[in-house]
C-alpha cells in the first residue's frame, strides 16, 4: 500500500509539523530512508514537504536537519524586517491604487520574502527529486498553488510515469519538474507575500481555493494517509463568552487565514471519514452492480495540536521585529487586543517555533501505537 504524507499550510505554525515528523522518525527504525512514497505540501507545508523529499539520507537525519532550520529561524530569514523595506513595500501597495491596483515592475505585497527564496533554494536539492523517483524511494512529490488567472487550485507534481495529470472542478494536477518557483508560489500568502510568475500565469498561496487538500495524494495513488494539520481545535467547538468590543482588523484577518489554512482540511477529513463508512458498509456485490469497485476505504491517521497555538503565539508577540510589531499593533494584533491568531502565521521566531516543535514531538509520541499500526510495525 502506498503511504502518503499530507502537510497543510499555516505559516510559522508549520513548525508543529516538524515536531510530529521528528516523533515519527524516533518511532520508526533508524534504517528507514523515506517512509512516505507520496508527499504533498501546501503553503508552509510545501517547505517541509520539499525539505524532506529533496534531501538524501535516512529519515531521522532529514527530520533532524529540518528541525535545525526551524530552531534557528528568524523573521529576517523569511522576509525583510528592516523599517525601510517594510515602508517601501507599504508605499508600493498604496501607490498601486493610482494604477488601478496593479503593481508596477513587480507584484505588490506588504512583505518581501526574498530571504526565504534564497534559503530554500540553497537547502532543497531539487535535482535529487528525480534521483529519488528513479531509484523507487519516492513515487511523487507535489506542491499546490492558486492560479490568479483561473482561480484554480493547481497541484504541481513530479512523479513516476504511472501518475497521470488530472482535471476536476476548480482543481487540476500538472506534471512538471519542480523548482524554487513552485515552492515560493505555494507559500505566497495573498497581500503579504508577492505572487510568483510561472510560465504566463501568476500564482499565490496554495491553501487559498484548495477545497480538497487531501485529493492530490489520492490522485497520485496513496491509499494510506498521514495528515499533519495545524489547527488547535480540530474536532472541538469551544464555547466562548462573547466579546466586549467589535473585532479588530487582526482578528478578522486571523479568521480569514484560519478559513484558508485550516477549515478546508478539517472539512475534507470529515468527508473522507463519511466515504470510508459508506465504502465499508457496501458489500462487494453491490459495488460491482453499481460499477464502483474502486470505492475502497482509505486508512487515515490525522495528527493536530493538542494545545492552543494562538495562546502560545500570544506569549511571543514581543519577539517580532519592531517594524512588524508596530504594523501589527495598528491592526489590533496585540496580546491585549487579540488577533494573535493572525500574528502566529508570521511568528518565525526561535522561541515560538521551538515550542511548536516540542508540542508536535509530544503529540506524535502520544500516538505511538497508532503510528506503529499505520506503518504496520
Spans of features found by a protein language model:
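Short helix-terminating capping/connector loops at secondary-structure junctions
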Residues: 31-35, 132-139, 291-297
Amino acid at each position: 500500500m502506498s503511504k502518503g504524507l499530507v502537510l497543510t499550510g499555516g505559516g510559522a505554525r508549520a513548525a508543529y509539523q516538524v515536531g510530529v515528523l521528528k516523533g515519527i522518525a524516533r518511532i520508526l527504525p533508524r534504517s528507514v530512508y523515506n517512509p512516505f512514497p507520496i508527499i504533498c505540501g501546501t503553503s508552509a507545508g510545501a517547505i517541509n514537504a520539499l525539505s524532506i523529499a529533496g534531501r538524501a539520507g535516512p529519515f531521522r537525519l532529514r527530520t533532524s536537519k529540518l528541525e535545525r532550520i526551524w530552531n534557528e529561524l528568524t523573521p529576517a530569514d523569511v522576509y525583510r524586517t528592516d523599517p525601510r523595506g517594510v515602508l517601501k513595500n507599504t508605499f508600493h501597495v498604496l501607490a498601486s491604487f493610482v494604477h488601478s491596483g496593479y503593481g508596477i515592475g513587480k507584484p505588490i505585497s506588504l512583505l518581501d520574502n526574498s530571504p526565504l527564496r534564497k534559503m530554500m533554494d540553497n537547502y532543497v536539492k531539487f535535482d535529487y527529486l528525480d534521483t529519488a523517483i528513479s531509484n523507487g524511494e519516492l513515487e511523487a512529490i507535489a506542491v499546490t498553488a492558486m492560479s490568479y488567472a483561473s482561480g484554480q487550485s493547481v497541484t504541481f507534481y513530479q512523479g513516476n510515469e504511472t501518475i497521470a495529470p488530472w482535471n476536476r472542478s476548480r482543481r487540476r494536477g500538472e506534471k512538471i519538474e519542480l523548482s524554487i518557483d513552485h515552492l515560493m508560489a505555494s507559500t505566497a500568502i495573498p497581500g503579504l507575500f508577492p505572487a510568483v510568475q510561472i510560465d504566463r500565469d501568476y500564482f499565490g498561496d496554495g491553501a487559498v481555493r484548495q477545497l480538497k487538500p487531501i485529493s492530490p495524494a489520492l490522485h497520485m495513488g496513496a491509499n494510506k494517509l498521514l495528515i499533519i494539520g495545524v489547527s488547535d481545535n480540530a474536532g472541538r467547538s469551544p464555547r466562548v463568552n462573547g466579546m466586549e468590543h467589535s473585532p479588530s482588523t487582526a482578528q478578522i484577518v486571523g479568521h480569514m487565514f484560519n478559513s484558508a489554512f485550516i477549515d478546508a482540511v478539517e472539512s475534507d477529513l470529515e468527508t473522507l471519514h463519511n466515504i470510508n463508512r459508506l465504502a465499508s458498509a457496501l458489500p462487494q456485490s453491490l459495488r460491482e452492480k453499481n460499477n464502483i469497485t474502486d470505492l475502497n476505504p482509505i486508512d487515515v491517521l490525522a495528527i493536530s495540536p493538542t494545545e492552543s497555538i494562538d495562546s502560545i503565539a500570544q506569549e511571543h508577540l514581543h519577539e517580532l521585529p519592531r517594524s512588524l510589531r508596530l504594523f501589527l499593533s495598528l491592526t489590533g494584533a496585540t496580546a491585549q487586543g487579540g488577533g494573535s491568531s493572525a500574528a502566529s502565521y508570521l511568528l518565525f521566531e526561535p522561541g515560538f517555533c521551538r515550542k511548536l516543535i516540542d508540542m508536535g514531538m509530544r503529540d506524535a509520541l502520544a500516538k505511538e501505537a497508532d503510528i506503529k499500526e499505520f506503518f504496520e510495525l
